[in-house]
Amino acid sequence: MASTVIYLDESGDLGWKFDAPYRKGGSSRYLTISALCVPTEKKHLPKRVIKRLYDKFNKATNDELKWAAMNSDERKYFAEQAHKLCLNHSDISFRAIVVKKENVLAHIRSDGNKLYNYMIKLLLIDFMAQFDVVTLIPDPRSIKVQSGNSLHDYLQTELWFTNKANTNLITTPMDSKECLGLQFSDMLAGIVQSRHEDNFAGIFQLLQGKISVKPLFF
């Protein structure tokens, strides 16, 4: 029975204040959701990358390493190791979707959770439909899992009724402090967000060809 694990995180915010620069009173202009997709039997491999990152830079594992707080050497090392992971394991994939928030219509802005859900569907539904069992692990502090209908129910309904897939979806929110797979996904989101928000392509180029990025409302 084919199964996969998907670790889901995001970068950016769901604010809509665009009359001031980002980080100076204004909201981010982009929102990125990233997914680390790994076969169930290989879910230990991305975790090893994060453990090596902690070891190389003498970081305490009880102090979560977040992309926003990493220096350039740490970021470069992660990107190089992530690239190597994909080279050695073609069934491990990195995916992301980026929304240009200034182009989001006003009535959609009123319910950010629905925007999250829609972005995640666009990003993952066709991939999920290839598997018998999908374990989805979002960070509840960032990915909003409730919006009237939960993200889980929304995706399961889409899989069964729209994609005609018999995929069984298991959604297990976890705190990223306790999950190295989510920390990996946080770093993926940071790489993609930096490419768009700050027009910084340096680290992103280290993963080009190994990360699939969907644009929304560009």
Language-model-derived ranges and their functions:
Residues 1-218:
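Phosphate-ester processing/binding pockets and catalytic centers
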